[in-house]
Amino acid sequence: MGLWKSSPFLAFSILVLCQAGGLQAAPFRSALEGLPDPTALSEKEGRLLLAALVKAYVQRKNELEQEQEQETEGSSITAQKRSCNTATCVTHRLAGLLSRSGGVVKNNFVPTNVGSEAFGRRRRDLRA
């Protein structure tokens, strides 16, 4: 997977090396000076190689995206309630637990004032 993330860099590097090979001011002289260099690519061959690399990269990227979509469609994602630990939320959860519990506690249970306006900010009287 890491190879495909670096493929654009790899393709660009190959292109730069091909172009830089043709622009050398002082070419490397070897013992086989009379023979053509088998590693040198013509401009047309370089473009074909680059096009093939880009095409292979795009195909592989599309395949990976399709695999990821299929994995996410097949997985069962369950919704979970967000956890809240403020005093209001804890009080509300305790009140709910007490109201669901049976026995003596239920008979003597007096509901508490819980909710968004129970603690903290309260509505002001507009008459004053």
Curated annotation (Swiss-Prot):
GO terms under cellular component: extracellular space
PROSITE patterns: CALCITONIN
Record's function text: CGRP1/CALCA is a peptide hormone that induces vasodilation mediated by the CALCRL-RAMP1 receptor complex. Dilates a variety of vessels including the coronary, cerebral and systemic vasculature. Its abundance in the CNS also points toward a neurotransmitter or neuromodulator role. It also elevates platelet cAMP. CGRP1 can also bind and activate CALCR-RAMP1 (AMYR1) receptor complex.
Residue positions, PTM Phenylalanine amide: F119
Keywords, alphabetical: Amidation, Cleavage on pair of basic residues, Disulfide bond, Hormone, Secreted, Signal
Any one biological process term the GO annotation gives: regulation of cytosolic calcium ion concentration
Signal peptide: 1-25
Region (Disordered): 63-83
Source organism of this protein record: Canis lupus familiaris
SMART domains (UniProt xref): CALCITONIN
Propeptide segments, given as residue ranges: 26-80, 125-128
An annotated Gene Ontology molecular function: calcitonin receptor binding
Protein name as annotated: Calcitonin gene-related peptide 1
